[in-house]
Design a protein with these regions (language model features):
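Secondary-structure transition motif
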Residues: 1-156
Length: 156
């Protein structure tokens, strides 16, 4: 399986006006930097907490989905939702979840498993889904850095 390795980060206001940069991720001391091909080989210093990886997937409009994006989605099926939620759309945040587990006697080294997941917040309940094929009409509606109010509205 091949996918485009791409990162994004929001520009550090100390160095630029807070634009989003997309490209290759570099570390320079304590600085996180993105080399955005749109601007040649210039490095752009970005805020560490805003760095997110491209999932390799796009939404129904062809928009690339990055870690930290807020997506509106509707599950194909009810589980784990009750029948009263059937057909309802949900907002969720895209996150990369990394799990570690111990090996066995044959392979004692520690193992890692990672997958993309949508953490759905509805009322006071939280759900998560890691099987993207179970979603349809997924649409990026913002991200948790520029649009935190979308998640706060869902939590209330």
């Amino acid at each position: 399986m091949n996918r485009e390795i791409l990162f994004r980060g929001k520009g550090n206001p100390k160095y630029n006006n807070g634009d989003w940069f997309y490209g290759y991720l570099l570390f320079d001391g304590d600085d996180y930097q993105i080399v955005d091909p749109r601007y040649g080989s210039c490095r752009r210093t970005v805020l560490k907490e805003t760095v997110g990886e491209f999932t390799g997937m796009t939404d129904k409009n062809g928009t690339k989905i990055f870690e930290g994006d807020i997506v509106r989605t509707q599950p194909f099926y009810d589980r784990p939702y009750s029948a009263t939620r059937k057909g309802k759309q949900f907002l969720g945040v895209v996150n990369l979840h990394i799990h570690t587990f111990k090996g066995n006697k044959i392979f004692p080294e520690q193992k890692y498993n990672s997958f993309w997941q949508v953490d759905i917040i509805e009322d006071t309940e939280k759900y998560n889904h890691y099987n993207w094929s179970r979603f349809w009409n997924c649409e990026v509606v913002g991200n948790k850095f520029d649009n935190p109010e979308l998640i706060k509205e869902e939590e209330q």
